[in-house]
């Protein structure tokens, strides 16, 4: 491979919550037992150095010693348009349809604020990304879950009958959709998205689609943007993206929305701008331009190969050494969602004991119950 995905780099003291946040009173219960180092496998943050074009773009901009007010560059918009066309087959995207968001979750709330009233019911699938749960609850929205169900092959699927039932019974007119799905790792097939959009159109449900993981698709799978499903989907959907998951840029801050519906776009732009908080950082702008290049695309292709190999190894190891721990190999993202129900029953253990055993030897992982997995670890 051309890029380095094997070096172990010490991130301690370098602004990495993945390791520095694991202290008593922080994000970890206590340090591991003597002789064990921390292996950060909790927050969605990779331990790979980012693509060189990003650091080069930032370094070049820093050489100019002025960081005053600025306008978003055409290079920024053109980089997004080209990236979406190259990676996702998107056509007809113009700069007018792109809007800056400090973060995907902030974009979710801005969109909900113009689509709903406080206290409205909003449809989400469960298991559920913990960020959705916190943001929607904190902002006064009521979450109605439609559980994903496993098919005969153990693959998580949408339960369309349950979705329709929940939509009708709860008078729902907005959904927050995750594609690819976190934490289950599903990369939805076209027929699944088409069927979901048919339901949303039938019952006048607006769609807020978090596609932040759309670049991290494991080999053998393909991401399909929700807005590409139909003209109605294009007009009904607020799509949210960011280079942060793909290139390890969460600390730089910077996401964006794509909204083709002008009336909806104008309202979301207005909502996002009300506090003047939702403002771009100049270095973040240059980082995106550095990321969304041909070299960035080549780097992502090698990243996908690396993650695919790591996932294959991890799932094979778990199946061989921990019978009873069920894990569906993710099709996208780099998260594993471990169902420990059978293993715990067979060994007389609780999920708390299993999690603690991991922390004792330095495996920093997350309680799956926060993601609506009753006996799970993410």
Predicted regions, residues:
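Conserved glycine-rich beta-strand-loop-beta hairpin in the small C-terminal domain of fold type I
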Residues: 289, 305-315, 327-341, 375
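Hydrophobic residues in well-ordered beta-strands that form the structural core
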Residues: 124, 145, 209, 365-367
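Conserved core segment of the aminotransferase class I/II
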Residues: 56, 230-308, 315-316, 320
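A short helix->loop->beta-strand "cap" motif at the edges of active sites that frequently abuts
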Residues: 141, 202-205, 234-235
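Conserved C-terminal alpha-helix-loop-beta "cap" of PLP-dependent enzymes
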Residues: 324-326, 338-378
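N-terminal small-domain helix-loop-helix segment of the aminotransferase-like
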Residues: 2-103, 110, 293-294
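Conserved core of the PLP fold type I
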Residues: 67-198, 215-216, 221-229
């Amino acid at each position: 491979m051309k890029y380095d995905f094997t070096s172990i780099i010490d991130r301690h003291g370098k602004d990495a919550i993945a390791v520095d946040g694991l202290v008593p009173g922080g994000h970890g219960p206590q340090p591991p037992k003597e002789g064990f180092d921390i292996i950060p496998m909790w927050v969605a943050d990779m331990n790979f150095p980012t693509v060189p074009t990003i650091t080069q773009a930032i370094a070049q901009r820093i050489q100019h010693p002025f960081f005053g007010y600025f306008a978003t560059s055409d290079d920024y918009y053109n980089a997004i348009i080209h990236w979406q066309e190259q990676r996702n087959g998107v056509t007809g995207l113009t700069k007018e349809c792109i809007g800056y968001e400090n973060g995907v979750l902030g974009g979710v709330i801005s969109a909900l604020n113009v689509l709903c009233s406080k206290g409205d019911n909003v449809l989400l699938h469960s298991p559920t990304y913990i960020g959705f749960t916190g943001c929607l609850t904190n902002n006064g929205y009521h979450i109605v879950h439609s559980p994903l169900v496993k098919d005969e092959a153990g693959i998580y699927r949408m339960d369309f009958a349950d979705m329709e039932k929940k939509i009708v019974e709860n008078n729902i007119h907005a959904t927050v959709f995750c594609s690819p799905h976190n934490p289950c790792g599903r990369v939805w097939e076209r027929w699944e998205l088409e069927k979901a959009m048919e339901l949303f159109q039938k019952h006048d449900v607006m769609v807020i689609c978090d596609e932040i993981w759309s670049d991290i698709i494991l080999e053998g799978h393909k991401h399909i943007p929700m807005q590409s499903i139909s003209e109605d989907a294009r007009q009904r959907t607020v799509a949210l993206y960011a280079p942060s998951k793909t290139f390890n840029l969460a600390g730089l801050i910077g996401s964006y929305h794509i909204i083709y519906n002008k009336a909806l776009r104008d309202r979301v732009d207005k909502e996002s701008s009300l506090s003047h908080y939702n403002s771009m950082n100049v270095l973040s702008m240059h980082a995106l331009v550095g990321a969304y290049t041909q070299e960035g695309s080549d780097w992502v292709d090698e990243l996908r190969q690396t993650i695919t190999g790591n996932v294959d190894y991890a799932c094979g190891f778990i199946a061989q050494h921990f019978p009873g721990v069920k894990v569906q190999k993710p099709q996208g993202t780099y998260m594993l969602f471990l169902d420990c129900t059978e293993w715990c029953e067979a060994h007389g253990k609780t999920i708390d004991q299993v999690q603690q055993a991991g922390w004792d030897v330095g495996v920093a992982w997350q309680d799956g119950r926060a993601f609506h997995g009753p006996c799970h670890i993410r």
